[in-house]
A protein has these predicted regions:
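A generic structural signal for alpha->beta connector loops
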Residues: 9, 32-34, 64, 94-96, ...
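Short glycine-rich phosphate-binding loop at a beta-alpha junction
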Residues: 7-15, 98-100
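Short, well-ordered alpha-helical microsegments
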Residues: 19-23, 106-109
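Short glycine/serine/threonine-rich phosphate/pyrophosphate-binding segments
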Residues: 75-83
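Short, small-residue-biased leader/transition segments that mark boundaries at the very start
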Residues: 1-3
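Short, glycine/charge-rich flexible loops or terminal/linker lids adjacent to PRPP-binding catalytic cores
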Residues: 20-67, 78
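PRPP-dependent phosphoribosyltransferase catalytic core
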Residues: 28, 82-154
Length: 154
């Protein structure tokens, strides 16, 4: 992060369920940060494709702040981009956004770079895998981050 980013108030934003453990890790470091939460999920279609549905947003003002959008997996990138748009619509434009993921795919990285404001977005991935399955899961990846943290959904 740039030192100027640290001069701004920090907001840690995450996508509910899968992102909560990652969110807590960032909050342990940025302990004075504000929080933002978004409920987003994949709505599968019969043909195997999906759309991302955003249903719940909880955030204060993002205007002029540094937002850390933390999502453990950046598969297609569409969830991160849609969540960013929803947060900006509700909370205003942050001065800078850092998207942080543990694992991304080449497709997800490319999508975020094309669909989020280039001048005010930084993307951080610990690893970038080359491949997605036909269901848009990262290969080899780590599996479903939410299921790993909380157990399989019923």
């Amino acid at each position: 992060m740039c030192s100027s980013d640290l001069d701004n108030e920090i907001v840690i934003a995450t996508i509910l369920r899968a992102g909560l453990p990652f969110h807590q890790g960032f909050l342990n470091y940025f302990d004075d940060a504000q929080n933002a939460f978004v409920s987003a999920y994949r709505k599968s279609k019969k043909d195997g494709t999906f759309t991302v549905k955003v249903e719940y947003i909880s955030c204060g003002s993002l205007e002029g702040k540094t937002m850390l959008l933390v999502d453990p997996m950046l598969a297609t990138g569409s969830s991160a981009a849609l969540v960013y748009e929803a947060l900006v619509e509700k909370g205003g434009m942050p001065a800078h956004t850092h998207v942080a993921s543990i694992i991304g795919s080449e497709q997800g990285v490319d999508y975020v770079q094309r669909h989020m404001p280039h001048a005010t977005t930084s993307l951080w991935c610990a690893a970038v895998d080359e491949e997605l399955t036909s269901r848009s899961y990262i290969v080899p990846g780590i599996g479903d981050a939410g299921d790993l943290a909380y157990g399989e959904k019923l």
